[in-house]
Amino acid sequence: VLNDNAPKPPSSIYDLEVPILGICYGQQIMMQMLGGSVISGSGTSEFGKSYVKLNTKSKNIKLLEGLFLKEGKEEVWMSHGDHVATIPKDFEVYGVSENAPFAIIGNEKKHFYGVQFHPEVFHTLNGKVLIKNFLKLSNFSFNWSMQSYLQQSVEEIKIKVGNKKVICALSGGVDSS
């Protein structure tokens, strides 16, 4: 985030009026692009197991439903050198860790959220709950199945191919089809 050539999304992404969840670097770049700041970790890096404590004002945040039920803290997996130093004025702090004062932040009105930890890894014990909550906020449909994917794919192929013939080459390898 702090390098001049650091990758960043187009700023127009924040105008799409869709929920956004920035994870680790994603949180940092979102904060920097929206008016917050990021600083180098000098002495405040976190790698491995950490605990995020809930800000007591954050009890009714939909992103956090079903979380922080045990002593108001969650075990998470951190892996960062840099961290957010300031957040834009329209964001709130939902959770903090020992070295990340903005471990969970959000803007409920815009449905923009950021976490400094990694909910996608199994080391974050309730990471799947957080991700599922975000998907609910995004109006994600939970009815995907391999069968529905297969049906949809077959229909799309029939539309594309019509009455023409096709050749399908398929090997039996696990990762080659």
What is the role of each PLM region?
Residues V1-D4, K8-P19, Q28, Q32-S177:
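RNA-binding accessory domains that recognize and position tRNA/RNA substrates
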